[in-house]
Structure formats: structure tokens, C-alpha cells
Amino acid sequence: MELILGSQSSARANLLKEHGIKFEQKALYFDEESLKTTDPREFVYLACKGKLEKAKKLLTNHCVIVVADSVVSVDNRMQRKAKNKQEALEFLKRQNGNEIEVLTCSALISPVLEWLDLSVFRARLKAFDSSEIEKYLESGLWQESAGCVRLEDFHRPYIKSSSKNLSVGLGLNVEGLLGALKLGAKLSLL
């Protein structure tokens, strides 16, 4: 059965590759600006549900579609993708030396199964090096990530402690997804 990743995220694609999951990547457009909530948990859930509804239109008998959405929460204040360098700097200042939460809602739909999961990755951060912040902002890498959080590079050396579910922090609950894929395979045999 073909797996489609309904996301343009390179981090999500890399997670699937690292776990040996073959997939095709397709962009699904969902207007997140239409969501009026500022509650991080509600927002990420509704965004993922919206993407899941779009995915249903692509669903055939021979495919599984995976979608996800992530936001960052600092003191219960939501951080999405920064619109510009100034907003990126504000996000990083709020994160500096604090605990951050990456909330990821992952979902899968197949002809036999619909699975949705909302998980949280928590990390306590050390203070950022101001010269490294400047380099990071100049690199433009922050533009790809909710809250400008890149656990795979910029944020990694600043993590004092964290929860163990790193894939959630990177944008997809791979462990949960693997379980859903196994269950879906069993159900399709019935």
C-alpha cells in the first residue's frame, strides 16, 4: 500500500526516511489563517483535522495518507511560523532559558483506519548565545519551523533536559504512526 505524506516539511520527510518508511510527498493546502483560536492545543488539533479532511479527497483503496501540524508553546503562548526576522527574534527571546513545548498533532487515514494523535515534546533550554542567534536569523532556516524551533540543529546544544519523544518535537509522532500502520495492515487482512 502506498503511503502519502501530506506535508512539505523536510523534517517530517526525514523522520519517515530514518525509519525506513517509503512514501511520496504531496502538499495539502489548508488555510490555517481561518482558525481563530489562540490556544496552542486547540489550534494544532484543528489544523491537523483540516488537513485530514483535505486528505480524504485524495484517498483511494491503495493508499495511506499521513498529515501533521506543529506549534510551539512558551508559557501557553502559541508560536507558529514567524512571518519575518523581527517576529523570529521575539520568539527566540521568549524561548531563551525557558521551557518550550512542541505540540504535534499527527494523523493517518486509510481505507480501514483513521488515527489521530496529539502529543507534546518538552524541552528546558539554556540561555542562547547572542552571536549564534544572529547567525541563525541570517541563515533563514528558522522560516521552515513553528516557533523557529529546530531541534535538529540550532536548538540542540541549548537543551538542558527534555522528554524522550524527539520525533514529536521534530513534527511527527513516528512511534504512534508505526503502531497505527501495523494496526491498519492487520485490519486490511480481515
UniProtKB/Swiss-Prot annotation:
GO molecular function annotation: nucleoside triphosphate diphosphatase activity
Main location: cytoplasm
Active-site residues annotated for this sequence: D69
Any Gene Ontology biological process: nucleotide metabolic process
The EC number(s) this enzyme carries: 3.6.1.9
Localization of this protein: Cytoplasm
Essential cofactor(s): a divalent metal cation
Keyword terms, alphabetized: Cytoplasm, Hydrolase, Nucleotide metabolism
Record-linked Pfam families: Maf
Domain of life: Bacteria
KW Hydrolase (keyword) present: yes
GO terms for cellular component: cytoplasm
Catalytic activity line of the entry: a ribonucleoside 5'-triphosphate + H2O = a ribonucleoside 5'-phosphate + diphosphate + H(+); a 2'-deoxyribonucleoside 5'-triphosphate + H2O = a 2'-deoxyribonucleoside 5'-phosphate + diphosphate + H(+)
Summary of the function given for this chain in its UniProt record: Nucleoside triphosphate pyrophosphatase. May have a dual role in cell division arrest and in preventing the incorporation of modified nucleotides into cellular nucleic acids.
Family assignment from sequence similarity: Belongs to the Maf family.
PANTHER family: BIFUNCTIONAL DTTP/UTP PYROPHOSPHATASE/METHYLTRANSFERASE PROTEIN-RELATED, BIFUNCTIONAL DTTP_UTP PYROPHOSPHATASE_METHYLTRANSFERASE PROTEIN-RELATED
Record-given protein name: Nucleoside triphosphate pyrophosphatase
Species name: Helicobacter pylori (strain G27)
